[in-house]
Amino acid sequence: MEAGGGSLCVFKDVRLHIDKGQFVAMVGHSGCGKSTLLNIIAGLEQPSEGAIILDGKEIDTPGLDRMVVFQNFSLLPWMSVYENIHLAVKAAFAQWDRKRLHDYVQRYIHMVGLAGSEHKKPAALSGGMRQRVGLARAFAVQPKVLLLDEPFAQIDALTRVNIQDELMHMWTATQNTVFMVTHDVEEAILLSDRIALMTSGPEAELAEIVDVGFPRPRIREQVMDLPEYSRIKKYIMQFLKNNSREVSAGGAVPGAGVLVSKPVGAEA
């Protein structure tokens, strides 16, 4: 897959296969095309070459089978918490009756800890609360793929930790397929099953994939105390350092006990 505008190629030859129910994170420097790739998967942009295949079918337009959570709290400002979630759920499950829709929406409001705030408009919510609404709305639609575009980038550190924990809980309960792009290495290790490492752009490439073998459900403190956690973090940080714009040589220094693989396949 290649994406570019005019003479600029953002990334090239990205082949990534994601199994159903996997949580995959993509890490790389700014400008490597992470968000562009996510937008292509979402159907919001088109690649100059290649294709996205979902369940054996090529996709090139937005759809309810892919829900995106952006970092900019993309809620409808004139609607309440309940209404923002209800609108998406009703579109996805038009055949449900009113009571079933209501109970289902309330379930996800409770799941993200917003019970009692369902009638508030986005302007009355903190950044963390707004992003909780976005996550609840995305999970509630039951998409085939949930796309997270640095969803916690604009949230303070303490709130970010709490919402990451809620995201782990929701993923455990739903087993959604998730593709997330992030600059936060610790976040990627904690949340994901595999971490795709991108070289620096322009003409960025998918260099390798790090397998994160921690069992689920995960408890933050226990995971961060594991020797393997430190090894994976060191490996990825070294990769990013070696692939900074100031360094011409690519590729991370192999780390003992870190399982990596070259990208294969071409499906999402």
Predicted regions and their residues:
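Helix-to-loop junction immediately C-terminal to a conserved catalytic motif
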Residues: A42
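Catalytic Walker B motif of ABC-type/P-loop ATPase nucleotide-binding domains
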Residues: L146-D149
